[in-house]
A protein has these predicted regions:
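Surface-exposed, charge/polar-rich loops and edge strands
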Residues: 1-214
Length: 214
């Protein structure tokens, strides 16, 4: 009878253990996200605060805030929806907010077409706190290696003829951790089944014939 392949079995076992651990971690993240969403719902009704100088605290999402953009340094556009549900291009400014610090990101409204920039030179902005656009790969979130997302201020009053930004919407906060957990558990189960079938076939196959004696 053939022996169980030791090294491949250890490698596959470790891979399965890692996938199961990631699934359990996603279930823990699901409970944490549910608590955060409840906090975001409360944030909508809380008093206005100054936009944070260190804009990476997710506990402030959906909180009313005010900040001063001394000057827009650069602009970028991202697709999105306006307050009426129409599609457009979000006009997002990277602002200088003071002598030091990371500055402030402000979404000033939506334009019907990409390109160009609003005729706006800065000023006081009131609105609510949201996440700035983020281009990190999804896989980093799945394995818990994503960097903290930067916050931005979504203006309540559009400028320069732009369409109004949407109001705070809790449905925009994804809580996909259960789906991610199921995926990891499925990956672990499939890997275990495939390896078990491969090992059984290997061990059940007849041994090669002995070489003829001379």
């Amino acid at each position: 009878m053939k022996r169980l392949p030791v090294i491949p079995t250890i490698v596959v076992g470790l891979a399965i253990a890692i996938m199961v651990a990631l699934g359990v971690w996603q279930l823990q993240r699901k409970a944490e996200k549910e608590k955060m969403i409840a906090q975001y719902a409360a944030n909508i009704t809380r008093p206005e605060i100054a936009f944070p100088s260190d804009p990476i605290d997710d506990a402030l999402l959906f909180r009313k805030a005010v900040g001063r953009c001394r000057a827009p340094l650069s602009w970028r556009q991202r697709s999105g929806r306006d307050a009426a549900g129409g599609t457009g291009w979000r006009q997002i400014a990277q602002c200088r907010s003071g002598a030091a610090g990371p500055g402030m990101i402000v979404q000033l409204g939506l334009s019907p077409q990409p390109g160009g920039k609003p005729a706006w030179n800065g000023g006081t902005v009131r609105g609510y706190i949201s996440h700035a656009p983020d281009d990190q790969p999804l896989i980093l979130s799945l394995i818990g290696m994503a960097r903290p997302k930067t916050l931005m201020l979504v203006a309540e009053t559009p400028v320069g003829g732009l369409a109004a930004n949407p109001v705070p919407d809790l449905s925009s906060v994804p809580n996909n951790h259960l789906a991610y957990a199921v995926q990891w558990f499925l990956f672990a189960g499939i890997a275990g089944i495939i390896y078990t079938i491969a090992v059984r076939r290997r061990m059940a196959s007849p041994p090669p014939p002995a070489p003829p004696s001379s």
